[in-house]
């Protein structure tokens, strides 16, 4: 099986993007792990698969696989690359598209010049939405860890996030605490662990230990989750610049019941073909 693909990234969060509309694609978890291997394959944080939409009125279906072979519900940086990919490949002439994901419909828009904006949908905060095992809904929760308790906010952006505030994101023990939060028993389906430093009301610095992928240079849904948690706690304004290790994105949220809008870069690195 020969597969044509594009290698892309959003803020250094890198992807192998495959057109499953014009070519037949059927990949096993083992094949995805091989493709994701940076020594033996293409190498990526996530594999993004473009498929035909299942329902009338939508443009495409968007599927995401981590480099461990597991399928996940959502990827914000990938959504921006998705919007650029379908335009560049001639799969659509639209700038704004409606895309089915495992957790609902999102609306990416390619703005040109390597920039895309995505309506990420309305965030959810009930513990059952992640899921997260808690007695009641709250703004923050105390999570017991081997290193001691930490205070987290939670949000679902179609995928689950736990966000904790830190004084210095560079000094945050992401490699140690990230896996402990990701696999904590309180998160039966695991969780993405965010570490947020608030610079001011319109600016944060962020690192994310992603479920199934480890720490990446940036996480779009993690940026959305961090900002909405900060806004709910009264710490941030409605428009926030998020500084990740891979670069900056802008997150906007008008409050409860409103969608989160994410704007940032989408870059094509190269195109290729691989035989499996």
Swiss-Prot record:
Site entry (Could be important to modulate the pK values of the two catalytic cysteine residues), positions: 161, 210
Binding site for substrate: 13, 46, 66, 76-77, 159, 192, 210-211, 220-221
GO terms assigned for molecular function: diaminopimelate epimerase activity
Pathway in which the depicted protein is active: Amino-acid biosynthesis; L-lysine biosynthesis via DAP pathway; DL-2,6-diaminopimelate from LL-2,6-diaminopimelate: step 1/1
Location(s) in or outside the cell: Cytoplasm
Subunit structure: Homodimer.
Protein name as catalogued: Diaminopimelate epimerase
Organism per entry: Chromobacterium violaceum (strain ATCC 12472 / DSM 30191 / JCM 1249 / CCUG 213 / NBRC 12614 / NCIMB 9131 / NCTC 9757 / MK)
């Amino acid at each position: 099986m020969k597969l044509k693909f594009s290698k892309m990234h959003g803020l250094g969060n890198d992807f192998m993007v495959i057109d499953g509309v014009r070519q037949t694609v059927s990949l096993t978890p083992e094949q995805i792990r091989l493709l994701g291997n940076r020594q033996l394959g293409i190498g990526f944080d996530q594999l993004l698969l473009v498929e035909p939409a299942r329902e009338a009125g939508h443009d495409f279906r968007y599927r995401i696989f981590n480099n461990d072979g597991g399928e996940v519900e959502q990827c914000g940086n990938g959504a921006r690359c998705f919007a650029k990919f379908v335009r560049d490949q001639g799969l659509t002439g639209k700038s704004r598209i409606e895309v089915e994901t495992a957790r609902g419909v999102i609306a990416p828009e390619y703005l040109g010049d390597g920039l895309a904006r995505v309506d990420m949908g309305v965030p959810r905060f009930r513990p059952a939405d992640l899921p997260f095992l808690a007695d009641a809904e709250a703004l923050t929760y105390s999570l017991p860890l081997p290193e001691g308790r930490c205070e987290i906010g939670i949000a679902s952006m179609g995928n689950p996030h736990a966000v904790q505030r830190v004084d210095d994101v560079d000094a945050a023990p992401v490699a140690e605490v990230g896996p402990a939060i990701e696999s904590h028993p309180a998160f039966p389906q695991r969780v993405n662990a965010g570490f947020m430093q608030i610079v001011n009301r319109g600016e944060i610095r962020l690192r994310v230990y992603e479920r199934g992928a480890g720490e990446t240079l940036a996480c779009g849904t993690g940026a959305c989750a961090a900002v909405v948690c900060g806004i709910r706690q009264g710490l941030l304004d409605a428009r926030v610049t998020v500084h990740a290790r891979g670069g900056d994105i802008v997150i906007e949220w008008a409050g409860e019941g409103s969608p989160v809008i994410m704007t940032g870069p989408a870059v094509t690195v190269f195109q290729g073909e691989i035989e499996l």
